[in-house]
Amino acid sequence: MIKSLLEGTWSQLRTLGMVFMHAFRKRETLQYPEEPVYLSPRYRGRIVLTRDPDGEERCVACNLCAVACPVACISLQKGERDDGRWYPEFFRINFSRCIFCGLCEEACPTSAIQLTPDFEMSEYRRQELVYEKDDLLISGPGKDHNYNFYRVAGLSIAGKGKGEAQNEAEPIDVKSLMP
C-alpha cells in the first residue's frame, strides 16, 4: 500500500516537473497573424502575370500553360495585335482548383507566369477565387528582370533583318544541308 502511494506521488511530481520545464521552452506554435510565417525560398504560392522591361505584357497566348496544368484551371483566348504579335484576349485562373504545382511556370516560354510566395487567398465564395487577367497582371518584370521574349525570338524587329537582332544567329538554309 505504501509502495503504491510512493509510486503514485513520484509519478505526480515527475509530471509536474515536466510541465514546469516545458513552460520555459521555446514555443513551437506561431501566433500566425501577429508573427510572420517562414516560407522556404522555393515556396509556390499565388500565380501572377508579369511584364517585360518595356512595360508590355509578356504572355504570347501560346496555351502551353493551360496544356501543362494537370487540373485544367487555366483558360485563355488568343488575339493578334496589328503588328502581328499574339496576346491573350482573356486569361483566367480558377484558384479553387489550382494545386500550385508550378508546371505552368515551367512550361511558359516567355517567363510570363510566375509563382509568388503569397498564400493568403481565402474568400467566402468560390466565384471570387476565379482571377481574370487584370487581377493577375503585375506592373513589374517579376523574377526575370531583363528578359524580353521578342528581343530573343519571335517576330523580326522593324529596321532589322533576320539574324541582326540581339542574341540571334544568322538563319541557316536547311535545304543546303541535305546530301
Curated annotation (Swiss-Prot):
Name the record gives this protein: NADH-quinone oxidoreductase subunit I
Keyword Signal: no
Cysteine pairings via disulfide bonds: none
Taxonomy, superkingdom: Bacteria
Pfam families documented for this protein: Fer4_7
Protein keywords: 4Fe-4S, Cell inner membrane, Cell membrane, Iron, Iron-sulfur, Membrane, Metal-binding, NAD, Quinone, Repeat, Translocase, Ubiquinone
Family per record: Belongs to the complex I 23 kDa subunit family.
Function: NDH-1 shuttles electrons from NADH, via FMN and iron-sulfur (Fe-S) centers, to quinones in the respiratory chain. The immediate electron acceptor for the enzyme in this species is believed to be ubiquinone. Couples the redox reaction to proton translocation (for every two electrons transferred, four hydrogen ions are translocated across the cytoplasmic membrane), and thus conserves the redox energy in a proton gradient.
Record field: catalytic activity: a quinone + NADH + 5 H(+)(in) = a quinol + NAD(+) + 4 H(+)(out)
4Fe-4S ferredoxin-type domain sequence ranges: 49-79, 89-118
UniProt topology in membrane: Peripheral membrane protein
HAMAP family in alphabetical order: NDH1_NuoI (MF_01351)
Single biological process term from Gene Ontology: aerobic respiration
Transmembrane keyword on record: no
Cofactor-binding details, from the entry: Binds 2 [4Fe-4S] clusters per subunit.
